[in-house]
C-alpha cells in the first residue's frame, strides 16, 4: 500500500492536497513513503470532491496543504480532506500547513474586524485536526489559536546558512524591515555574528499593501544588507525598504523570506528592484513569471520531514532547533 510506514504497532500515512504537489512529493521522499493516491476534483459549480484510494483506519495521518492562490479554495479542500480522514477512522490527524493562510489577520486593528487567523484554526479543529505543523507563522500568538498541539518550524537555519556561505560576514548587516521583525532579525545576528539595523515604516491602514518608509536605524553605509522577513506578498514593503537602504549608502541588498506569496505587482517590482538576490523557501509554489536569475528557492522539505518523523516517533520537534 502506498504512503505507509510502520513502526511497531504504529502506521504512518502521508496525504496531500492539490495546492503544492511538488513539495508533498519531496517531503514524502525524505520520509521514505509515498503520497497516498487521492481522487480529487471540482464540480461544475466549484464544489470540491475528495476520496482516498486506500484505507486510513487506525493510521497516524499527515496531511500537507499550503495555502497558496486561490487561497480560499485550497483551505476548503484541506478542511474537506481532514473531515474525510476523521470519517475514515484515522487514529490521528496532523495537518501540515507550510504557509498558514490569513496569518496577517491575527488581531483586531480596529473595531468590527474579524480575527481570521483564529477562525482558520477553529475550522481545522472542527474538521477533525489533532495537531498543526506549520512554518514561520506571521506572529507567534497564532500558536495559541488552535485547541491542540502546534509545532512551529523555522526556516532561519536554511536561509541564514545560505546567505552566510555567500557573503563576506565582515561586511554583513542584518536588517529588519520593521519593528515587528526585530526578534527574528536578532536571531539572524546571533547565527551570522552580524550587526543589526532596522527600517522604520508607516502603513496607511485605509489602503491595502501601501507602505511609506521613513528612516533607517543603524549603520548600513558600505555594508551588504540582508533584509529578513517572514513573507513577501506584493513586494511593496520589502522593495521600499531596500530603496531606503541604498539611499543610506548600502553596497548591496539581499532579501530573504520564508514565504514567497508574490501576488499582483510582485513580479514587476522584483524584476525592477536593485536588490541583487531574493531568497525564499518553497513553502509556496513560485509563479512561472518569477523564475528569474535573481530569485533563489531553497527546499523546506527536509525541515518538514524531520518534524513529521519526530511527531510520528514521539520524539522532540523542539530539539531540531535547539541550536538557535
Curated annotation (Swiss-Prot):
Named from the GO MF annotations, one term is: magnesium ion binding
Q: Could you tell me what this protein does?
A: Involved in the biosynthesis of the central metabolite phospho-alpha-D-ribosyl-1-pyrophosphate (PRPP) via the transfer of pyrophosphoryl group from ATP to 1-hydroxyl of ribose-5-phosphate (Rib-5-P).
User: What Gene3D superfamilies does the record point to?
Assistant: 3.40.50.2020
Q: Which residues bind Mg(2+) 1?
A: 138
**Pathway recorded for this protein:** Metabolic intermediate biosynthesis; 5-phospho-alpha-D-ribose 1-diphosphate biosynthesis; 5-phospho-alpha-D-ribose 1-diphosphate from D-ribose 5-phosphate (route I): step 1/1
Known partners and oligomeric status: Homohexamer.
The entry's family comment says:
Belongs to the ribose-phosphate pyrophosphokinase family. Class I subfamily.
Q: Which residues bind Mg(2+) 2?
A: 178
Q: What is its EC number?
A: 2.7.6.1
Pfam families reported for this sequence: Pribosyl_synth (PF14572), Pribosyltran_N (PF13793)
State the free-text cofactor note.
Answer: Binds 2 Mg(2+) ions per subunit.
Where in or outside the cell? Cytoplasm
- The gene designation is prs
Under SUPFAM superfamilies, the record lists: PRTase-like
Q: What is this protein called?
A: Ribose-phosphate pyrophosphokinase
Q: So which cofactors does this thing need?
A: Mg(2+)
Species source reads: Streptomyces avermitilis (strain ATCC 31267 / DSM 46492 / JCM 5070 / NBRC 14893 / NCIMB 12804 / NRRL 8165 / MA-4680)
Amino acid at each position: 500500500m502506498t504512503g505507509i510506514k510502520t513502526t511497531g504497532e504504529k502506521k504512518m500515512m502521508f496525504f496531500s492536497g492539490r495546492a503544492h504537489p511538488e513539495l508533498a512529493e519531496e517531503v514524502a521522499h525524505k520520509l521514505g513513503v509515498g503520497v497516498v493516491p487521492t481522487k480529487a476534483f471540482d464540480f461544475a459549480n466549484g464544489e470540491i470532491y475528495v476520496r482516498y484510494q486506500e484505507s486510513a483506519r487506525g493510521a497516524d495521518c499527515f496531511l500537507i496543504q499550503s495555502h497558496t492562490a486561490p487561497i480560499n479554495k485550497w483551505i476548503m479542500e484541506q478542511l474537506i480532506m481532514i473531515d474525510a480522514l476523521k470519517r475514515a477512522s484515522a487514529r490521528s490527524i496532523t495537518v501540515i500547513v507550510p504557509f498558514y493562510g490569513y496569518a496577517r489577520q491575527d488581531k483586531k486593528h480596529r473595531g468590527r474586524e474579524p480575527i481570521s487567523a483564529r477562525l482558520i484554526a477553529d475550522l481545522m479543529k472542527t474538521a477533525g485536526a489533532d495537531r498543526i505543523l506549520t512554518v514561520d507563522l506571521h506572529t507567534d500568538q497564532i500558536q495559541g489559536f488552535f485547541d491542540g498541539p502546534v509545532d512551529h518550524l523555522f526556516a532561519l537555519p536554511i536561509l541564514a546558512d545560505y546567505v552566510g556561505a555567500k557573503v563576506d560576514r565582515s561586511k554583513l548587516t542584518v536588517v529588519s524591515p520593521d519593528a515587528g521583525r526585530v526578534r527574528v532579525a536578532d536571531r539572524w545576528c546571533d547565527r551570522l555574528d552580524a550587526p543589526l539595523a532596522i527600517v522604520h515604516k508607516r502603513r496607511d491602514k485605509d489602503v491595502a499593501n501601501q507602505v511609506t518608509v521613513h528612516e533607517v536605524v543603524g549603520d548600513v553605509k558600505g555594508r551588504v544588507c540582508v533584509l529578513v522577513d517572514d513573507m513577501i506578498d506584493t513586494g511593496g514593503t520589502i522593495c521600499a525598504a531596500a530603496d531606503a537602504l541604498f539611499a543610506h549608502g548600502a553596497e548591496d541588498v539581499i532579501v530573504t523570506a520564508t514565504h514567497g506569496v508574490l501576488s499582483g505587482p510582485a513580479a514587476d517590482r522584483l524584476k525592477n528592484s536593485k536588490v541583487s538576490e531574493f531568497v525564499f523557501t518553497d513553502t509556496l509554489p513560485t509563479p512561472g513569471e518569477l523564475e528569474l536569475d535573481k530569485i533563489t528557492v531553497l527546499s523546506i522539505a527536509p525541515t518538514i520531514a524531520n518534524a513529521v518523523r519526530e511527531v510520528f516517533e514521539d520524539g522532540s520537534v523542539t530539539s531540531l532547533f535547539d541550536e538557535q
